[in-house]
């Protein structure tokens, strides 16, 4: 019985330790929601996701992930967008540098803007 309790306690501690640590003070989360000009077009969606992934090479980005909207019946959830991008920067300065980086501007002008009818950005600072 002691062994079972000991194992249960160990597993509980391990599961708590697997949570991501809180973001550091001064970091910025950059959230981009994109509505496609041709909603549901798989080739366009793939091009948008690939363009987002290419941005990983830009310095100052601590985290980048992109995906599609999760359908929801909850009235509070806005699932009307097609592609979402979440990024974390180590500072406001890094975000500002990213915004003017030629690689970012190229993807915005050659892929994101031409294939998007709407783009909404949220920046969250800690």
Model segments located where?
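Bacterial N-terminal signal peptides
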Residues: 4-15
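Short S/T/G/P-rich N-terminal loop/turn motif that feeds into the first structured element of a domain
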Residues: 13-82, 90-96, 123-126
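Histidine-centered active-site/metal-ligand motif
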Residues: 30, 101-104
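A common structural junction motif
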Residues: 53-56, 103-108
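Short, exposed beta-strand-loop hairpins at the edges of beta-sheets
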Residues: 96-100, 108-116
